[in-house]
Amino acid sequence: MKYLRSLMQQFVTACKNQAKLIQQFTLSLLYLFIIHIVALLFFFLFRLVLFTSIDYQFPPDIQNNFLMQATAFIKGLWFDNVIACYILLLPLVILWITALCNYHSKWVFRFISIFFILFYSLSFIISAANIPYFSYFFKTINSSIYNWFGYGATTAGMVLGETSFYFPIFLGLISILLLSGSVLRLSSYFYHLINSKSTSISPINRLCIFATGAVCIGLCLFGIRGRMGYNPIRVSQAYYCTDPFLNQLGVNPVFNLLTSTLDDNRKENRYLHLMPEQEAITNMQSILQRKGIEGISPIAREVKCAA
């Protein structure tokens, strides 16, 4: 009888330990999920600020159509989730592997915190910059901004000298500070919570964690792809009506900048090098019998008015 009671106690203890281990991984997933939701809320905030600050007059058939306008925010959530899943993938894989190894170190959570803060800070800077960019060019920020990098001092003077840019800059900085504080607090809280439930791991636990993690990673990859069709999500998926502002409002600026940069670097869109550039210039100067004008063009010529 004592042996049976001892066996039952060992079984109950083992079940509790296995439940704790599963709970550890569940807490890790909850930690990532909360950060994911917080980031989506910030992306929504940037879109709402753009919507309310833009000086745009809707057509009469759309001006009072709340459902039509709200659809842009739903589309925006779709695109925001794609970017958030890109950022989520690496931390998810890391916590999955550490859970399989039953390894929960402080440096892991510290690295994940820095990773989230770094990439979401960059995303928020782009989202904040998109507000004045859209106001001036009436299009979502794209790879054309790289053209301004060659004029650093001029660009900085334009940004800092324009008072209308101060609010987006302030919004971006506040968002970064709030997200950084939230991520650090969540990381510290869940690290201590997970380590308070430390226990050994069994093959069954590893199998459960492996299956759960694989499903979550699969869902994250699907979130990155954005749709079930043959092609992954594209900017054109945001277009749903005849209004140009609403069609562009749903596009995440980080997504648009990323995809436009990748498109620029495609083989068919690269700069053509049919022959050495200097050789081509020399040939054209010889054919046109021009020496060019320095600072203007290698084939420019001076035209003087007849007296």
Per-region residue spans from a language model:
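Detector for methionine-enriched segments
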Residues: 1, 8, 68, 158, ...
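Short, intrinsically disordered terminal tails adjacent to the first/last structured region
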Residues: 1-18
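Transmembrane and membrane-interface helices of multi-pass
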Residues: 15, 21-267
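Membrane/wall-proximal cationic-aromatic binding patches
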Residues: 165, 250-307
